[in-house]
């Protein structure tokens, strides 16, 4: 099967209605992957910070916005919320990078994903979260399968 490849950056999301491989690289950011097995459609977001503070544009840079927008985008192509499942990745804290108010940004990003998905009654079926290493993930849209590789630190 021929797969279209789509790479998403921080603050982006993508829903694949044709067989695709959606990829991203994560550090403290989190990616939520949604899959509807009845429609065989998947989507992924990649957000940088947990919560929009109501200042400026409500961007998918923020977890609460990115997750809501991803759910809406899946519904816009015919998916039903009750048929969606989620897989979560990222939220690393390399060398305690990005500490804010005693809690690391990666940890806050993880918490907001759990909170919103629970609130929306979307079951989390797999996750690889936290730790100190980055991740590269690839989502096969028609199966919902995610391949993960850890990013190793290299010094020159």
Swiss-Prot record:
Claim: Metal-binding is one of the keywords in the record: no
Keyword list, A-Z: Chemotaxis, Hydrolase
Function: Probably deamidates glutamine residues to glutamate on methyl-accepting chemotaxis receptors (MCPs), playing an important role in chemotaxis.
Lineage start: Bacteria, Pseudomonadati, Campylobacterota, Epsilonproteobacteria, Campylobacterales
Top-rank lineage group of the source organism: Bacteria
InterPro entries in alphabetical order: CheD-like_sf, Chemorcpt_Glu_NH3ase_CheD, Cytotoxic_necrot_fac-like_cat
Protein name: Probable chemoreceptor glutamine deamidase CheD
EC number of the protein: 3.5.1.44
Top class in the EC scheme: hydrolase
HAMAP family the record matches: CheD
GO terms of molecular function: protein-glutamine glutaminase activity
Gene Ontology biological-process entries: chemotaxis
Family: Belongs to the CheD family.
Catalysed reactions, as listed in the record: L-glutaminyl-[protein] + H2O = L-glutamyl-[protein] + NH4(+)
Species name: Sulfurimonas denitrificans (strain ATCC 33889 / DSM 1251)
């Amino acid at each position: 099967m021929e797969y279209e490849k789509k790479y998403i950056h921080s603050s982006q999301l993508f829903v694949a209605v044709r067989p695709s491989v959606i990829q991203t690289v994560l550090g403290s950011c989190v990616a939520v992957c949604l899959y509807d097995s009845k429609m065989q459609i998947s989507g992924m977001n990649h957000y940088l910070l947990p919560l929009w503070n109501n200042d400026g544009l409500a961007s998918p840079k923020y977890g609460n916005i990115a997750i809501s927008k991803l759910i809406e985008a899946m519904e816009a192509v015919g998916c039903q919320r009750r048929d969606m499942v989620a897989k979560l990745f990222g939220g690393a804290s390399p060398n305690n990078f990005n500490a804010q108010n005693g809690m690391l940004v990666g940890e806050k990003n993880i918490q907001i994903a759990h909170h919103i998905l629970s609130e929306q009654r979307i079951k989390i079926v797999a996750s690889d979260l936290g730790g100190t290493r980055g991740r590269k993930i690839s989502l096969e849209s028609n199966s919902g399968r995610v391949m993960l590789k850890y990013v190793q630190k290299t010094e020159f």
